[in-house]
Amino acid sequence: MNRNEILFDRAKAIIPGGVNSPVRAFGSVGGVPRFIKKAEGAYVWDENGTRYTDYVGSWGPAIVGHAHPEVVETVCEAALGGLSFGAPTEGEIVIAEEIAKIMPSVERLRLVSSGTEATMTAIRLARGFTGRDKIIKFEGCYHGHSDSLLVKAGSGLLTFGNPSSAGVPADFTKHTLVLEYNNIAQLEEAFAQSGNEIACVIVEPFVGNMNLVRPTEAFVKALRGLTEKYGAVLIYDEVMTGFRVALGGAQSLHGITPDLTTMGKVIGGGMPLAAFGGRKDIMECISPLGGVYQAGTLSGNPIAVAAGLKTLEIIQREGFYENLTARTEQLVQGFRTAADAAGIEFTADSVGGMFGLYFAAHAPRNYADMARSNIEGFKQFFHGMLDRNVAFGPSAYEAGFVSAAHTPELIDETVAVAVEVFKAMAE
């Protein structure tokens, strides 16, 4: 047995499923997960000492590359001053001001430690602000693992959702309406039927949890128009897309001003940090100013804030997003060409430093489209690349990520590996 196998067996004896987040167990692709020992730049090394070119990027945060020397130095310096205080710090103010400068929709902001905390609190805040209970989410969009959002679509188009996890009471989800992404007719009907009861709509403005799915321009406009018409809060869940698809997030590309925004991943620079923010009148409903309660022992942790501030500084340097976007487009175009040459039905898409790979003729517009793609084809591709030391997320439903550490030469090397894999798949 190699070290990965030994550690996985050992982990399963003490950690449920052997992992601390389900997708890491390789359940949807089969095989043994790689236990990572270290990471640097565009690479990760497993416990066997094998180096992989990494397109997981810690599921998005590693936008400047793993263990960026400036970020590491900043974290080490901050740690010398203490690891956690449970009290306000100047750094909290500075990072909130910086985010508000980059993302003008954020008039007030609060820091938390995880994306789940951010979305959970944003939902609570929207309900407290509007005095309404019902919420709309979209099938295939993931907003963390709070009870109200662990919901799958009901049996009919406009039935309220069913729990998608054991342990979630039906009473928690009866207020959650699950609609099809990019389906304007369903959205209009939902508001026509229940508009005055809907507290908020929460949406991934580019979906990253049913692979990368783009919204149509008309869908985005309908989201903003209907929420404004009925007095519902529009929540952009930019935990994944914020500072990843563009400096100002997806909202800057859409030209949309959401009422609330949740963010995470990139803003922590690899450390546990997330936030929610938006309109002043809504945000001031949060305790201690208002009656909506939220708290956290490690919220605004000084080490995470330091890492986040340095990362935000780096990504604002000249040419950062132009180069990131070019490298990501180079990757997906190379993959499309390689698959076409091998006669494999495949396409790919990207926005900023985020990309999607689809074993289908066309990129999906919603969850049903994605579910019809060739999942077995993805599994073959995933293992073919992994066996050749290139790592992607172990699920056909996860987007991938390019970092500033991925050079044009490294992208070319990855495409050359994909040429081999697609040829092998075609044989």
Curated annotation (Swiss-Prot):
Catalytic activity: (S)-4-amino-5-oxopentanoate = 5-aminolevulinate
Magnesium recorded as keyword: no
UniProt superkingdom: Bacteria
Keyword DNA damage: no
Enzyme class label: isomerase
GO biological process entries: protoporphyrinogen IX biosynthetic process
Cofactor: pyridoxal 5'-phosphate
Entry EC number(s): 5.4.3.8
Entry's family note: Belongs to the class-III pyridoxal-phosphate-dependent aminotransferase family. HemL subfamily.
NCBIfam families: hemL, PRK00062.1
Protein known as: Glutamate-1-semialdehyde 2,1-aminomutase
Taxon lineage: Bacteria, Pseudomonadati, Pseudomonadota, Betaproteobacteria, Neisseriales
